[in-house]
Amino acid sequence: MSALHYEVHGPSNAAATVLLSSGLGGSAGFWLPQLDALTDAGYRVIAYDQRGTGRSPAALPEAYAIADMARDVIEILDATNTSQCHFAGHALGGLVGLQLALDAPSRIASLALVNAWSKPNPHSARCFDARLALLGACGPRPYVEAQPIFLYPAAWAAENAQRVADEVDHAFAHFPGEANMRARIAALRAFDVDARLADIAAPALIAAARDDTLVPWTCSQRLADGLRDVTLDFMPHGGHAHSVTEAEAFNRSLLDFLSRVSAPAVPA
């Protein structure tokens, strides 16, 4: 058993398992727009709340690192008798996937990296500085009120105002605490595997939105340039959470990638 909360969806006898890892919020619920598409396609799907978030409460140490989060995934894979998975990670979740592909490559059949990065960049650092300053000065409610500004395009957020308001209320009700949030942000800010990208053999889908206001799409291009086996999916719009705002298009791309990397090799 794992101390972390996880959910298993889809057929238990599926030939392949997809594990979904969320971004800074850490909640399995981020992937709701993908669940039906993946299970309908025949995949077994694991989603989880990351340590110190949601239904996986824990006090995180100051030195908490992405490598610790990768070990948590191994714990979940072991608890679910999953020898290998297709790993999909959004932002921070993508960093977890990269770390896992380096530390335990036999557990990773493929990577889908959504608006992720391989090393720090000054624009995202400025965004996190502003968010942490807001958290420290004003508390969690203004912090979560500002979150949609970084996640969604303005037009989409305006058109989905009630949904966004409900998400903000939910995020505030389940806020993991300032100490945990600072530890998680420190972990993602310290992450740098740029010099080791070529060591990762797993095929990777690099998905990004060019209008992401939190993580420049060029960070995904950097991943594509450094990894060995890459499929690119750059969308013109959708924001940092384009797997939510452009779910149908994203799901098509993800399923197409998974069908190719899951297919058995054809004899020559």
What are these regions (language model features)?
Residues 122-124, 141-196:
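Conserved alpha/beta-hydrolase catalytic His-Asp/Glu region
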Residues 98, 102, 109-138:
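Flexible "cap/lid" loop of the alpha/beta hydrolase fold
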Residues 89, 93, 97:
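Gly/Ala-rich beta-loop-alpha elbow adjacent to hydrolase catalytic centers
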Residues 238-251:
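Catalytic histidine-centered segment of alpha/beta-hydrolase-like enzymes
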Residues 2-59:
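Conserved HGGG/HGGXW glycine-rich cap/lid loop of the alpha/beta-hydrolase fold
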Residues 200, 206-208, 212:
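Short beta-strand/loop motif that positions the catalytic acidic residue
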Residues 213-219:
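Conserved alpha/beta-hydrolase "acid-adjacent" motif
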Residues 35, 46-88:
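Active-site loop/oxyanion-hole signature of alpha/beta-hydrolase fold enzymes
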